[in-house]
Amino acid sequence: MDGKNCSSVNEFLLVGISNKPGVKVTLFITFLIVYLIILVANLGMIILIRMDSQLHTPMYFFLSHLSFSDARYSTAVGPRMLVGFIAKNKSIPFYSCAMQWLVFCTFVDSECLLLAVMAFDRYKAISHPLLYTVSMSSRVCSLLMAGVYLVGIMDASVNTILTFRLCFCESNVINHFFCDVPPLLLLSCSDTQVNELVIFTIFGFIELITLSGLFVSYCYIILAVRKINSAEGRFKAFSTCTSHLTAVAIFQGTMLFMYFRPSSSYSLDQDKIISLFYSLVIPMLNPLIYSLRNKDVKEALKKLKNKKWFH
């Protein structure tokens, strides 16, 4: 494209979820409640794990980082979306838009890989229980998390640089409630083929690593569970994985549908609904899944409830 037609954009206008005045108040109250639940539940989970020594294990170390990722990427999107319901000015500065996407992408990618790491942790706990604390030492856990966050930051940085160096010369109106890449690519008047190829390749690689890790880990888990003689022992061993499997099914199902659906079926309205689900609904569900189905967490909550805070 001719460079003289490429004018700089200082801000974008976020259309939001709905422009209907009668619906805005209802949506604002609904998503304010959802966002508060996300903060209370995920930060509460982190605090609970830190306070209860019984939860100072690799499994709950990774769970605390899952809660941190949920709280972080939902916070990148939630407050700005809530402001959009009540503010007349729906603009977001160019660099704020870039930062929003950078933070969001970093922690979504991190959560994607973290779910595979958590499956590996379950494999170690079930297949090699006697060596579990040695093989999953605090140093190993910290290195795994460092790798997870490093990949997330690298992918998000590449995505952000490639997207926000494009030309936006015809319109600055984003038909979305946050600065997501697909609507930005549609908005650009530059050739976006390289962006689409790089984004698809990197995210596809991350998904391949994640799904391969999940598949291999659970194959070994199933083999280990089958070797347990008693039915009660098999049930107890596999029950530790049910919360994780539920979280994986919801998160990965949404991600795969979002980024690997046929281009012919793509629509921005559908995109907004799916984005809403994985940016706010999933972070609300994860702590509920892990607390309602987890005996250790429920026991820790009970101890916290019965603790005498004032003497």
From Swiss-Prot:
Keywords: Cell membrane, G-protein coupled receptor, Glycoprotein, Membrane, Olfaction, Receptor, Sensory transduction, Transducer, Transmembrane, Transmembrane helix. GO terms for molecular function: G protein-coupled receptor activity; odorant binding; olfactory receptor activity. Its main location: membrane. Glycans are attached at residue 5. Residues 50-57, 121-139, 220-236, 293-311 are cytoplasmic. Pfam families: 7tm_4. It comes from Canis lupus familiaris (Dog). Putative odorant or sperm cell receptor. PROSITE patterns: G_PROTEIN_RECEP_F1_1, G_PROTEIN_RECEP_F1_2. It comes from the Eukaryota. It is a multi-pass membrane protein. Residues 1-25, 80-100, 159-196, 261-272 are extracellular. InterPro entries: GPCR_Rhodpsn (IPR000276), GPCR_Rhodpsn_7TM (IPR017452), Olfact_rcpt (IPR000725). The keyword DNA-binding does not apply. This is Olfactory receptor-like protein OLF2.
